[in-house]
Amino acid sequence: MKTRITNLSLILILAACGIIFFAGCATTETANTDKTKSLLSQAGFRVRTPQTAKQHELYASLPSNKLESGTVKGKVFYVFKDEKAGVAYVGGEPEHQRYHQLCMQQHVAQAPEEEMKHPFAESWSNQWGPRVVHP
């Protein structure tokens, strides 16, 4: 009987951990989507709501939360479908390039800085010549 209770406890603990894990993943996905939409807007992508039957058909065929590219009459365009809001972010090559610049800036801004270990830092700084302190 004690083994059965222990097994039941283990199952409940694993189930709770699974629920917490998947809830955390959903929260992370939402945060990433919100960040992407913000960067797309900053880059100049325009928010469009499908109006015609053809637009609704095209919108329905797009994958959600993924930046897709297409070419029409030699012009490249990019679309990000926000299914939750029922809109698409649409931009051309200049907006796409700006989006990538913003992503890089955001990534670099969030990169952690690490302090060099003392012996390595000292040997690194000595490579640039003697230190001169100006009054």
Identify the residue ranges that each predicted region occupies.
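C-terminal partner/receptor-binding element of secreted or periplasmic proteins
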Residues: 94-135
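Periplasmic N-terminal soluble interaction domains immediately after the signal peptide in Gram-negative
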Residues: 62, 66, 84-93, 103
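Post-signal-peptide N-terminal segment of Sec-exported extracytoplasmic proteins
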Residues: 42-80
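Solvent-exposed coil/turn segments that connect beta secondary-structure elements
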Residues: 72-75, 81-85, 93-96
